[in-house]
């Protein structure tokens, strides 16, 4: 079942890249939220090397029992300040950085760990109250601040647009 689903997603990705004329690398992140460590091991055996977890504690538990090829672990869920000390040593990329205060804490913990923590700045492009993230207006200031931190490296943005049936409306959020 996992193999068939993975192959279908990989085909859709390849088709989308071809349609867009892209030849650069795209990373598939296998989200294993609420799945057992055996699911992580299965996707790793199928060649996936990047895993996304929503919760720090769940990732920590899986890492303790995971037995398979080396993986890159990403935190894709909201990161609370009180979880930064646990998150930084575990994750190669944190997708949900939404404040200067959080950047400060990540920088401090990363320095203690002797690493540069890769992050994505989360921007709430749709201004949805139900979603976390920087406002479009606050983004430049936080981005510039992040550049001053020696143990944080901004790799890009994480943006989630609202669901629309009509693709043209969705594209407006990313222009």
Per-region residue spans from a language model:
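Conserved alpha/beta-domain cores
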Residues: 1-175
């Amino acid at each position: 079942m996992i193999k068939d689903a993975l192959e279908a997603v990989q085909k859709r990705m390849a088709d989308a890249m071809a349609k867009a004329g892209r030849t650069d690398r795209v990373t598939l992140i296998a989200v294993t939220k609420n799945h057992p460590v055996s699911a992580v091991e299965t996707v790793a055996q199928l060649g996936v090397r990047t895993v996304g977890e929503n919760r720090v504690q769940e990732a920590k538990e899986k890492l303790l029992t995971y037995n398979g090829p080396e993986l890159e672990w990403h935190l894709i869920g909201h990161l609370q300040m009180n979880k930064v000390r646990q998150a930084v040593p575990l994750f190669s990329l944190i997708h949900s950085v939404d404040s200067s205060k959080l950047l400060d804490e990540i920088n401090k913990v990363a320095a203690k760990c002797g690493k540069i923590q890769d992050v994505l700045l989360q921007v709430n492009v749709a201004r949805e109250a139900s979603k976390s993230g920087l406002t479009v207006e606050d983004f430049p200031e936080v981005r510039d601040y992040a550049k001053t931190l020696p143990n944080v490296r901004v790799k890009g943005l994480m943006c989630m647009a609202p669901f629309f049936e009509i693709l043209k409306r969705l594209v407006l959020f990313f222009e």
